[in-house]
A protein has these predicted regions:
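Long, intrinsically disordered, low-complexity Ser/Thr/Pro-rich regulatory/activation regions
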Residues: 210-226
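Hydrophobic alpha-helical positions that pack around
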Residues: 59, 73, 77
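NUDIX/MutT-family hydrolases
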Residues: 121-157, 170-178, 196-206
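Short helix-coil junctions and helix-kink-helix linkers
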Residues: 182-190
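N-terminal strand-loop-strand
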Residues: 15-57, 70
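Active-site segment of metal-dependent pyrophosphate-handling enzymes
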Residues: 24-28, 70-71, 82-121, 137-138, ...
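Short, His- and charge-rich active-site/binding loops that engage polyanionic ligands
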Residues: 42, 47-49, 53, 60, ...
Length: 226
């Protein structure tokens, strides 16, 4: 017990760890999906000075010694894109040995789902020259292994859409069937028959039809909520 305490004191005084094993750096990378009612978008930043300068990449960065990985993800997202109050969910860890040419880096991937219109004022900050939304089907060449990270995030988005409806975060609180169909087509890269989709969708127990002011003749244009 005394030996452990002594190590803690030494670590506090020297501000460094005492372990003999080399340490990998830890980063957070954020895949922020946005939906505009028709297509799926990804929020990217243009890198500043250093490795992969002027390449587009995911917003993210190195974890500070005094913060959690979740705090790191939120901080980096806000610093580099000005996006605030974003719900982030961890989806995967990427640890390929040579994924970063600078040093040994393990990154934790975070997935975010937003309505693109709510974050139209994104802008580059900190070490990001620029922040911009890109259509998921038209992504530029990316730095590091970020193409792989986005693909994994897209797969995770599909899983969450099937299991817990997380992708509904991309819709307004009240939404039309056609808007949901567009979202599903964007997420699953599949075209759905409008009539069959409507029948399957309206039978879901967690979907409520808005009985507000819609006349019976306009049921196909009705709005729904969770």
């Amino acid at each position: 017990m005394r030996q452990i305490y002594a190590k803690q004191v030494i670590m506090e005084e020297n501000k460094e760890y005492c372990y003999k094993y080399p340490h990998a750096a830890i980063t957070a990378d954020n895949v922020v999906f946005g939906f505009d009612g028709k297509g799926l978008y990804v929020l990217l930043i243009k890198r500043g000075e250093g490795t992969y300068e002027d390449f587009w990449a995911l917003p993210g960065g190195f974890m500070h010694i005094d913060e959690t990985i979740e705090q790191c993800a939120l901080r980096e997202l806000q610093e580099e894109t000005n996006a605030k109050d974003v719900y982030l969910e961890q989806f995967h860890v990427f640890s390929t040995v040579d994924r970063d040419p600078r040093e040994r880096v393990v990154t934790v991937g975070f997935l975010a789902l937003v309505r693109k219109g709510d974050y139209s004022n994104v802008r580059g900050g900190d070490d990001a020259k620029e922040a911009k939304w890109f259509n998921y089907e038209q992504l530029p060449q990316l730095a590091f292994d970020h193409q792989e990270i986005i693909a994994k995030a897209h797969s995770a988005l599909r899983d969450r859409m099937r299991s817990n409806g997380l992708a509904f975060c991309l819709l307004d609180q009240k939404f039309g069937v056609d808007e949901l169909r567009s979202l599903c087509e964007a997420v699953f890269d599949t075209k759905y028959d409008r009539r069959n989709f409507y029948k399957k969708f309206t039978s879901a127990p967690y979907i409520l039809e808005d009985e507000g002011e819609q006349p019976m003749a306009c049921r196909r244009a009705a709005h729904y909520s969770l």
